[in-house]
UniProtKB/Swiss-Prot annotation:
Protein name as annotated: Photosystem II reaction center protein Y
The entry's keywords: Membrane, Photosynthesis, Photosystem II, Thylakoid, Transmembrane, Transmembrane helix
Intervals, Cytoplasmic compartment: 23-34
Cofactor note: PSII binds multiple chlorophylls, carotenoids and specific lipids.
Length: 34
């Protein structure tokens, strides 16, 4: 159903944007722990 894609696309874009912003911080935290 194309409506599922219409709903999922912005959700995936937002998730990808959030991951891209959070990832460097998360990596820094992990390196601090190790």
């Amino acid at each position: 159903d194309w409506r599922v894609l219409v709903v999922l696309l912005p959700v995936l874009l937002a998730a990808g944007w959030a991951v891209r912003n959070i990832l460097p911080y998360a990596v820094k935290q992990v390196q601090k722990l190790l």
